[in-house]
């Protein structure tokens, strides 16, 4: 819910095992629909409210971004820039893109505007001029994947009100404006994907999603130690570090503590080397 101070208040949470998705890409729409339905049902039960529309966070290696510009003439006779002029300018950014048929625009995020000879304008509304130009970061995604998500949500009994790419959603949730102004990189490591968002001078410079996550580290540990995935995950969480120099070469981990069927001691330094690699 939106509280009186305009901040969001969490009234319900729902979770479900992520099935039918591999590295951020839907591979089984029916399994995704069942997971969405279960998570939504739990959230509705906790909150006491039903919801027929949701906001969707998009991820996957098909998420790409590129710079683009758009130009329009200021519409008012007195030359004052209106919200409609800004909207038309961003629409022109999208219109000037040459995208293949299998991709579509998710966001056109303005970085700065130029009004005649005035550059690096953050918000041109209310200013006066003749020619308005927008410099934007355009985020695109796979049309097929977006449609697959929409179909899965419909099967789950809901619809997407709007979509936002995961790196941008994560940045909006955890970064302060001062951090964006100073410049920072937000890296979000998930189970099968890792996303990043790069900010400088308050602007989003770049975002990306890579098909590598913490699950790949777990798999590497399982192979390196010749143990099960469950034991490898437990070892990673309790003893894992990406810097071998943080641990002593004589430190050892007893695998039998995680599974009675496992035997032997392994070097924690070796575990760190696997994670670092």
Which residues fall in each region the model found?
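A short acidic Gly-Thr/Ser loop motif
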Residues: 1, 58-60, 186-193, 199-202, ...
């Amino acid at each position: 819910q939106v509280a009186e101070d305009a901040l969001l208040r969490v009234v319900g949470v729902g979770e479900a095992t992520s099935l039918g998705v591999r590295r951020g890409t839907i591979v089984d729409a029916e399994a995704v629909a069942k997971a969405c339905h279960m998570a939504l049902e739990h959230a509705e039960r906790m909150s006491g409210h039903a919801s027929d529309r949701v906001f969707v966070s998009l991820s996957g290696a098909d998420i790409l971004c590129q710079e683009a510009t758009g130009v329009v003439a200021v519409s008012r006779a007195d030359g004052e820039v209106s919200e409609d002029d800004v909207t038309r300018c961003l629409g022109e950014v999208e219109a000037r893109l040459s995208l293949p048929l299998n991709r579509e625009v998710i966001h056109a995020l303005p970085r700065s505007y130029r009004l005649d000879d005035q550059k690096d304008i953050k918000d041109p509304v209310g200013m006066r001029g003749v020619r308005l130009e927008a410099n934007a970061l355009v985020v695109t995604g796979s049309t097929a994947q977006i449609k697959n998500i929409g179909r899965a949500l419909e099967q789950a009994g809901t619809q997407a009100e709007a979509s936002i790419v995961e790196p941008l959603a994560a940045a909006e949730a955890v970064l302060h404006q001062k951090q964006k102004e100073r410049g920072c990189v937000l890296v979000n490591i998930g189970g099968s994907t890792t996303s990043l968002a790069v900010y400088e001078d308050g602007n989003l410079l770049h975002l990306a999603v890579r098909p590598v996550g913490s699950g790949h580290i777990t798999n590497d540990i399982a192979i390196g130690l010749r143990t099960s995935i469950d034991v490898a995950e437990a070892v990673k969480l309790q003893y894992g570090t990406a810097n071998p120099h943080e641990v002593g070469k004589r430190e050892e981990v007893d695998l039998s503590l995680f599974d009675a069927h496992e035997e032997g001691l392994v070097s924690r330094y070796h575990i760190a080397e696997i994670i670092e690699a």
